[in-house]
UniProtKB/Swiss-Prot annotation:
One of its GO terms (cellular component) is cytoplasm. Has a role in meiosis and sporulation. Residues 92-177 form a coiled coil. Keywords: Coiled coil, Cytoplasm, Meiosis. Its main location: cytoplasm. This is Meiotically up-regulated protein PB17E12.09. The keyword Cytoplasm applies. It comes from Schizosaccharomyces pombe (strain 972 / ATCC 24843). One of its GO terms (biological process) is meiotic cell cycle. It is found in: Cytoplasm.
Amino acid sequence: MQDRFLKENTEIINLSSSIHPNRDSYLDSQSDPLNQNLYNIETENVKDLNIEDVDYYEKLQNFKIVDENIDPGLRTYSKRSVGVNNTFQNPCNRKIEGYIKEIERLSNSNKNLQAAVLQMAVSDTDDPRLKEEYKQTEKELLREISGNHKSKILKLEEELNDLKHSMKEMQLYMTKIIDKAMNNASLENLFSLDENNTKIHDK
């Protein structure tokens, strides 16, 4: 039984070797010297391809980027197919934005805390010079804090103004449509009145 199994597998191996011969043995077995010369030229020009040889942008575009160790919300895929224009997006953009917002929040909290400490220092000190210095520092902090809040308020006001402008344009557009519809209805009524008058006169 074992001899039969080995024989069958040996025949399969021999058959596959005859169908797909080894490249080197195939070229070496060719009697035509032209084939051998072409093979020598090809092997001389072959060199190892390093990762640095691939353009960085192409690497980003041609590979699917999925890191199983990061937050699933940050996972992104970059796919490139023929005829499709896909833009690579940095998977850490949202994380960085979150860090920036958190830094701003902590910075404002720190400034508020410093202002509170300065208020306590002003009330606790008896030295007029230190008291004036503390007050001045407190004013600068409060001015900076209010400036941050003002900038946010101004940004919200700009967005609100843009929204109002868009709503106004939409209202004007709707008014034009309604006016046009009313004019069409008035013309239809006018034509119907003319037809009725004509029928009355004919009688």
